[in-house]
Amino acid sequence: MCGIWSIVNKSNIDIKKYLNDFWNLKNRGPDNSHLETFSNVYVGFHRLSIMDTSFNSNQPYVLHDKNRTIVFTCNGEIYNYKELDKEYNLNVGTSDCLIIPKLYIHYTNNYSIDDFIKLFNDNIKGEFAFTLYEFDEMKNLSKYIIGRDHVGVRPLYCCTDNNNIDFYSSEMKGMLEYDGKIQEFPPGTIKIVTNNLFEYSHEYKLYSNIYSNVPFEDDTKIISKKVRDAVINSIKRRLVSHRPIAFLLSGGVDSSLVAAISAKLIGEPIRTFCCGMKGGTDMKYAKMVADHIGSNHTEVYFTEEEGLKALEDVIYTTETWDTTTIRASVGQYLVSKYIGTKTDCKVVMVGEGPDEVCSSYLFNYYAPSFYELDSCSKEYVKNIHMYDGRRADRCVSRFGLEARVPFLDAEFIRTYWSICPSLRKPNNIFMEKHWLRKAFDGLNLLPEKILWRKKE
């Protein structure tokens, strides 16, 4: 994870009191921190080096094009940047995030800004929260663009005071000195603010690549292959890293599939971690998976006292009072602390997502209709950034690590939602996540007891 932080100062107010808040995000990017002023815009970035660990990828990126200057920061990973670089001949090297401002320059020079926005629906594969500021030849701010990925895997908050400042930060704790209303920047949104004679703001929604209606598939053989391919593709994209990768393994089907498929793709033992209390069931099932896939497995135990002691920082870290999120965050916080302080891993693969995407909560058995189940699933995914997505991001980034969430990949979501809702509803014939499980049935990827382990 990285931390982005910026202020557009509209009326020359004294913003010195806000600058200390920039350092509240340091844990998100322990490798390099930079804060710079461009005209009336303050741009800060804390970097966790994952792709291209050299200083060449330190942000903010400053690009000069004819009579304009582009200043760009991004907390994200663009997994298909090499393909895009080759297609457009942009020469981004090994810096994945640099592809976005390079594409912006290319499209605004040759096509339109609307065509640039469409790339986020159709071409750019990854998760991101970014700020892009464009200055004219007189170094005046002419426009700026703020964007966040389709389900909000990467966090972003904003404060807008029409008379004084626009404020953007990866976490709310980067805005503690601001006494106005803090809002979460909406997932799946690109916002453009034009700053010429008068300010004009327009928002584009990126939902069409997953939330649009698609023809439903009911051929079970086709379903299994499509789901299997989508899962493998989503995981494969996230295995690209210049830093070591850890895998959280609870023994549930979600994290177990991520670990098992990754082990096959990598072709050598991976490093798995399970966290729990003595007597818990997760440890037993996680060990079963670890033995089956031959991983280097670590068990991290904590006591009730240690869990309670961590609560205060868990609440500060997750920035929520939601009791379910806090309860579920304690274990992830403690295992992330272990990985961050006792290993050299910097990327953490997690299994969040299928409960929402696949309608896997036990109450889904009682959905009144297939189509209400479909609607409910989409609503849960739209809100996942406030709950499980928040937990995965904050608990992992708290210790200078990056969480990757393959089951929130747009390809997987779109593929699973293309299954006819009548086949997705859990019942006496199809258990929850049936088609996710069925896609890997009979491959000896996981023990049958794990692959078909019912959600507890």
Predicted ranges, named:
Residues 33-36, 95-99, 432-439, 452-456:
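Polar, surface-exposed loop/tail segments
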Residues 18, 64, 74-138, 248, ...:
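Short histidine
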